[in-house]
């Protein structure tokens, strides 16, 4: 479920905001149908929904372009999830111009940031500063993920309105859905909304499958494997809701209709897109590669500390934010594990970034952390050379080169020997001798021989555990229309029985309300009962009480307490003496 989400600043930043913000009169008129879709009307539209939505924060006028087909996962089919855009005509065109790295860095500094001694951008307006910044402060706790219970979709002239989100152009495409640029009218912020098709998830995953052979045991190491593609999405959502790190993309909101096909996930928009395209004739300099690779190390260390294996690290999944730092995205094939490492047995991810042990025909189980380290090595190679170390158009030949071909470095550009040593140790074909993340953090090239030390694990990581209950409750489902109608009818009839079964409930006698048979009698009721008992003792033995309603004082006749004490129960013989208070307390 890999999706490459990237964006470039638009040449006209004000236009999309006016189009999406709904400032004009025509826009306000088009929003009136959304106000009318409250209550049952809005629920009736749920039956037409066929998606999950994921949204990511983005800046006004941003677009996202796709990575190359070779960078996409093996399962990608390139098909778009169908989305109702009836009545849509011309869609607003977002600029396709990309900024160079020099323009990006200059634009970041012009926005009010400054550089520290290590060349990192310090942005005081952000909720947190870069970890290595001298002005760094503890990060604020992340905003909790919103779980929407109601969804309404309205088609407009050039876009689709989904709750408070206005969906615009497609900015990315993955194996199981598309990513849309979304504008939130409540907070005036752009997001990236991921629309997933449940049917496509199940179909491309090959479900239903045959059960495993008898006697098959799960792989040791405590690796949690989802039972199916839908459960895998829910696990991804539960993981993303807990992650809070400057170098990991954040999940904002999730919407789900259990009776329809689509799931909607909303992510923060990382506006500058992927760190680079592969292949490219303009690779990064060593200083730029070191800057981004330090962020990648901190993000991977945080994920491994949270017991998560990403399994799809590549440049197209490393998105550059406003502050110039990268964020790791796309957890569609990630694995959660227990213990010290994940022992995996399946092969997922992008072919050019797969480790040789995952392609071996003899090795059945392999380390999850070592897979991420190999992918980090291929990514660093791409940073400085603009291409993958092992390439072939035929997938089987590519697998053969990854497993057996020796690592070679091009003559140009000329890189430092320390960098060659680091890449060689990360691309060691033997996972047992391959370098690990704690050793990478201390490598001379990464730290510039001690001049730029990375933060310790305690400073960079805080453990967050995801329970099975949180995975089950990762998405709040929207109730179906029939259920809502049934509940509202039961509330209106004040009955817990099914109002559509045709049987009528027996009418209750007005002479003995249930609350008067169970609640404690008041002082007025007790005094009136004592008065009646005294009057009965003074009357002759053969005297009968006067018929109900046929005389007596107005106070006694109008008192509901006396009415309940004197009234006979339905279907029972009339009593010849009044009820005592303790008798009135006992329900029949």
Swiss-Prot record:
EC number: 2.7.11.17
UniProt xrefs under PROSITE patterns: PROTEIN_KINASE_ATP, PROTEIN_KINASE_DOM, PROTEIN_KINASE_ST
Membrane-spanning residues: none
Catalytic activity: L-seryl-[protein] + ATP = O-phospho-L-seryl-[protein] + ADP + H(+); L-threonyl-[protein] + ATP = O-phospho-L-threonyl-[protein] + ADP + H(+)
Residue ranges, annotated region (Disordered): 1-33, 78-100, 128-149, 205-225, 497-588
Coiled coil: none
Listed Low complexity bias regions: 128-139
Residue ranges constituting the Protein kinase domain according to the UniProt record: 165-446
Keywords, ordered alphabetically: Acetylation, ATP-binding, Calmodulin-binding, Cell projection, Cytoplasm, Kinase, Nucleotide-binding, Nucleus, Phosphoprotein, Serine/threonine-protein kinase, Transferase
Modified residues (Phosphoserine): 100, 114, 129, 133, 137, 495, 511, 572
PTM characteristics: Autophosphorylated and phosphorylated by PKA. Each isoform may show a different pattern of phosphorylation.
Top-level taxon: Eukaryota
Subcellular location: Nucleus; Cytoplasm; Cell projection, Neuron projection
GO terms (BP aspect): calcium-mediated signaling; CAMKK-AMPK signaling cascade; cellular response to reactive oxygen species; MAPK cascade; positive regulation of autophagy of mitochondrion; positive regulation of DNA-templated transcription; protein autophosphorylation; protein phosphorylation
Activation and inhibition: Activated by Ca(2+)/calmodulin. Binding of calmodulin may relieve intrasteric autoinhibition. Autophosphorylation does not alter activity or regulation by Ca(2+)/calmodulin. In part, activity is independent on Ca(2+)/calmodulin.
Residues engaged in binding ATP: 171-179, 194
Cellular component terms per the entry's GO annotation: cytosol; neuron projection; nucleoplasm
Region (RP domain), start-end ranges: 204-226
Biological role: Calcium/calmodulin-dependent protein kinase belonging to a proposed calcium-triggered signaling cascade involved in a number of cellular processes. Isoform 1, isoform 2 and isoform 3 phosphorylate CAMK1 and CAMK4. Isoform 3 phosphorylates CAMK1D. Isoform 4, isoform 5 and isoform 6 lacking part of the calmodulin-binding domain are inactive. Efficiently phosphorylates 5'-AMP-activated protein kinase (AMPK) trimer, including that consisting of PRKAA1, PRKAB1 and PRKAG1. This phosphorylation is stimulated in response to Ca(2+) signals. Seems to be involved in hippocampal activation of CREB1.
Subunit organization: Interacts with calmodulin.
Name this polypeptide is given: Calcium/calmodulin-dependent protein kinase kinase 2
Phylogenetic classification of the source organism: Eukaryota, Metazoa, Chordata, Craniata, Vertebrata
């Amino acid at each position: 479920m890999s999706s490459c989400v990237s964006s470039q600043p638009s040449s006209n930043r004000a236009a999309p905001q006016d189009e999406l913000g709904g400032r004009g009169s025509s826009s306000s008129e088009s929003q009136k149908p959304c106000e009318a879709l409250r209550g049952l009307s809005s629920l009736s539209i749920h039956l037409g929904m066929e998606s999950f939505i994921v949204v990511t924060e983005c800046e006004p006028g941003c677009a996202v372009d796709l990575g190359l087909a070779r960078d996409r996962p093996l399962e990608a089919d390139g098909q778009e999830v169908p989305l109702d855009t009836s009545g849509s005509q011309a869609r607003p065109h977002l600029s396709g111009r990309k900024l160079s790295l020099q323009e990006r860095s200059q634009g970041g500094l012009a926005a009010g940031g400054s550089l520290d001694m290590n060349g990192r951008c310090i942005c005081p307006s952000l909720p947190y500063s870069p970890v290595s910044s001298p002005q760094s402060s503890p990060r604020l706790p992340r905003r909790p993920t919103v779980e929407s219970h109601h969804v309404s979709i309205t088609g407009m002239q050039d876009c689709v309105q989904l709750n408070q989100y206005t969906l615009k152009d497609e900015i990315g495409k993955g194996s199981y859905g598309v990513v849309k640029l979304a504008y939130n009218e409540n907070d005036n912020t752009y997001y990236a909304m991921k629309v997933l098709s449940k049917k496509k998830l199940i179909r491309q995953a090959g479900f239903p499958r045959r059960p495993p052979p008898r006697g098959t045991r799960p792989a040791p190491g405590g690796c949690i494997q989802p039972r199916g593609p839908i459960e895998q999405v829910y696990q991804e959502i539960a993981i993303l809701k807990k992650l809070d790190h400057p170098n990991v993309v954040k999940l904002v909101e999730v919407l789900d209709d259990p009776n329809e096909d689509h799931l909607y996930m909303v992510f923060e928009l990382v506006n500058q897109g992927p760190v680079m395209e592969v292949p490219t004739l303009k690779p990064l300099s060593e200083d730029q590669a070191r800057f981004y690779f330090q962020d990648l190390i901190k993000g991977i260390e945080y994920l491994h500390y949270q017991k998560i294996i990403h399994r799809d690290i590549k440049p197209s999944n490393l998105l550059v934010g406003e502050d110039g730092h990268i964020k790791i995205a796309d957890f569609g094939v990630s694995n959660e594990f227990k213990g010290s490492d994940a022992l995996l047995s399946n092969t997922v991810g992008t072919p050019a970034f797969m480790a040789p042990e995952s392609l071996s025909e003899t090795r059945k189980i392999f380390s999850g952390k070592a897979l991420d380290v190999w992918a980090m090595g291929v990514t660093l190679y791409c940073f400085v050379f603009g291409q993958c170390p092992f390439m072939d158009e035929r997938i089987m030949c590519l697998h053969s080169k990854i497993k057996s071909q020796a690592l070679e470095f091009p003559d140009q550009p000329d890189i430092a020997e320390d960098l060659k040593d680091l890449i060689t140790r990360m691309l060691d074909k033997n996972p047992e001798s391959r370098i690990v993340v704690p050793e990478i953090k201390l490598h001379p090239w990464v730290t510039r021989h001690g001049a730029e030390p990375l933060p310790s694990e305690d400073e960079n990581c805080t453990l967050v555990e995801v329970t099975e209950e949180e995975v089950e409750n990762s998405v709040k489902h929207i109730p179906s229309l029939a259920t809502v109608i049934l509940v509202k009818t039961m509330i209106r009839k004040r009955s817990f029985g099914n109002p559509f079964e045709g049987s009528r409930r027996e009418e209750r006698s007005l002479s003995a309300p249930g609350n008067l048979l169970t609640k404690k009698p008041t002082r007025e009721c007790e005094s009136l009962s004592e008065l009646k008992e005294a009057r009965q003792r003074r009357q002759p033995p053969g005297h009968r009480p006067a018929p109900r309603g046929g005389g007596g004082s107005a106070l006694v006749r109008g008192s509901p307490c006396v009415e309940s004490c004197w009234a006979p129960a339905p279907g029972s013989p009339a009593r010849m003496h009044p009820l005592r208070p303790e008798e009135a307390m006992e329900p029949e």
